[in-house]
């Protein structure tokens, strides 16, 4: 169906959603940060020098989702009605996974808000732990699921099942 953010002359535009119906829309994005053993332990035990890493990262992820339209030029400003940021720690991978779920009743979806929320949360983990690990890697950020609107349900699922009980 082509790119929607360009006019017939190739100039960037914000898509006109005026005539679209308000519907409940929800999106979940995920990503992960891999860390060394020292960081993993400090985050899990709450002993990182800068404080409660996952608590601060949760707040940052919510703030990131709310500020998406300030960061992504063609994103509409949306009245988000729900934003939930959750972490899962998988010791066998020395990885901290982040899920961000965003909901809105509106004319356009919240995929970018969910992706931004997960990204900002993981960047915050990086920022708070960079003194302990110079080789952390953020990756595998993608849309897991979205619902509502013209596209209906899109379920990409998780790329890899995480081991049960490792949270």
Which residues fall in each region the model found?
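C-terminal binding/interaction regions
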Residues: 1-54, 59-167
